[in-house]
Amino acid sequence: MRTAIIAGNWKMNKTVKEAVELVKELKPLVKDAKCDVVVCPTYVCLPAVLEEVKGSNIKVGAQNMHFEESGAYTGEISPKMLEELGVHYVIIGHSERRQYFNETDETVNKKVKKAFEHNLIPIVCCGESLEQREGNVTEKVLEGQIKVDLKELSKEQVEKLVIAYEPIWAIGTGKTATDEQANETIGYIRTVVKSMYGEDVASKVRIQYGGSVKPGTIKAQMAKEEIDGALVGGASLKAEDFSAIVNF
């Protein structure tokens, strides 16, 4: 049985003070959660948020990282730095990174490998555009992404990582994939993992849905057999909304 995982991606929101206030408010609301709870603040908020979640069931993730340990990469953060801080998870290959920062599947794969070297659990994002969905090439696109994103990993690593299926057309648009669409597509992603690493590994990989997840949509989504959680954007910025999702 896979343990559900709900992660909040705060994106470029919340000052340090606001981040601490949000986590303070969140802690009592999610203390009895039956799923893994993760918050992913901005880099500058990580130390304060890590301090605030001590003793609670909330884990902390970063929103990105570089694949090198150090070097002349102005503005970047290395996995070594995240590991030293005590970060547990790291989002890799979010559609906004792919869209605005030209991140490729090859880059994603380098980051995934490096994350494991530093005891970080990657939340690997994949998804198709509206054009690709309407052109009936969703499966082809996702297979292409997964086969590169997850190449040359050990079975143990693949079992540990989290995949987030986020249809790009449903991010921040208010549009969502139907529960059936999400379940079917996540099931397909699992078959791609199976073709690479076998049935046993594929059955253990946790695959989230991401794309305008709200308190009103989560229950039906989580009732689907293939969906193991959610990567939540805007709704993770309010303790009331995020806790309602976590306590689905």
Swiss-Prot record:
Chief place of localization: cytoplasm
Reaction equations catalysed: D-glyceraldehyde 3-phosphate = dihydroxyacetone phosphate
GO cellular component, one term: cytosol
Binding-site residues, substrate: N9, W10, K11, G172, S212, G233, G234
Keyword Cytoplasm set for record: yes
GO annotation terms (biological process): gluconeogenesis; glyceraldehyde-3-phosphate biosynthetic process; glycerol catabolic process; glycolytic process
Catalytic-site annotation from UniProt: H94, E166
Annotated pathway: Carbohydrate biosynthesis; gluconeogenesis; Carbohydrate degradation; glycolysis; D-glyceraldehyde 3-phosphate from glycerone phosphate: step 1/1
E.C. numbers: 5.3.1.1
Keywords: Cytoplasm, Gluconeogenesis, Glycolysis, Isomerase
Alphabetical list of PROSITE patterns matching this protein: TIM_1, TIM_2
Key word Isomerase present: yes
InterPro entries for the chain: Aldolase_TIM, TIM_sf, TrioseP_Isoase_bac/euk, Triosephosphate_isomerase, Triosephosphate_isomerase_AS
One Gene Ontology molecular-function label: triose-phosphate isomerase activity
Compartment annotation: Cytoplasm
Gene3D superfamilies in the cross-refs: Aldolase class I
Assembly and binders: Homodimer.
HAMAP family, per database record: TIM_B
Family named by the database record: Belongs to the triosephosphate isomerase family.
UniProt xrefs under NCBIfam families: tim
Biological role stated in the UniProt entry: Involved in the gluconeogenesis. Catalyzes stereospecifically the conversion of dihydroxyacetone phosphate (DHAP) to D-glyceraldehyde-3-phosphate (G3P).
Protein name: Triosephosphate isomerase
